[in-house]
């Protein structure tokens, strides 16, 4: 099925709407009009973009303007096929690896090529450029329009596993599990899977050496993958939203606003919790092998001095 996207003036948008009014159907989120004919689906988004999909998409779209140039971003290594940004892709990303408090979260999300424009309309982009309130809003919208699978490794399990394996291996196991879960739910396999690279490909699969069901078909790895395909950006936003929800719950449990990251503010809060609840409870809420533990212990000792 062909897809053409035009950026049209308000006047041209109204022309499209007028031409397709008798074929009108209920529009998707962030769209003000949609129509379906035998050969083409037309969607007019609030942003002014108009998407034509179907066998007659190009023939119909050319009546109204020239298509927006499609993004074909690839890493410098050239390891991804041409036009990859417009494929139907499962993206996978993780959140929480560098945070002392809170779990490790991995999300695998599928964006069909027919939904790429819709996902962009929802505001999906590199999550580092999105505020926490917006993350929550976009994640709610994504929940309604794309399939995804998530895995949460809570701190008690994280600390237990960390005694015998690296964080990298834990992360790889979570990615593989989320990918397996999502793939079993899809009606047809994606054109590709893109993992935001946290380890070299050989190292990633070495981490999975003991796993029976290793996802290997059409799997690509790239750093800064959020900027390469919107599926990874969507996965990252969903993972962050889940992580934020977990942190909210942790704040309620402790009666303290729990900060993200692993900086000096984290040390101060950890020291306070250590004094109030003791080391066993602190271990339930943190990645205990981080250097923050020793720093919090030192701060707690200073505060306890007469």
UniProtKB/Swiss-Prot annotation:
Catalytic activity: Endonucleolytic cleavage to 5'-phosphomonoester
InterPro entries in the cross-refs: RNase_HII/HIII, RNase_HII/HIII_dom, RNase_HIII, RNase_HIII_N, RNaseH-like_sf, RNaseH_sf, TBP_dom_sf
Keywords: Cytoplasm, Endonuclease, Hydrolase, Magnesium, Metal-binding, Nuclease
Cofactor, free-text remark: Manganese or magnesium. Binds 1 divalent metal ion per monomer in the absence of substrate. May bind a second metal ion after substrate binding.
Record-annotated disulphide pairs: none
Subcellular location: Cytoplasm
Transmembrane segments: none
Domain of life: Bacteria
PROSITE patterns: RNASE_H_2
Protein name as it appears in the record: Ribonuclease HIII
Organism: Exiguobacterium sibiricum (strain DSM 17290 / CCUG 55495 / CIP 109462 / JCM 13490 / 255-15)
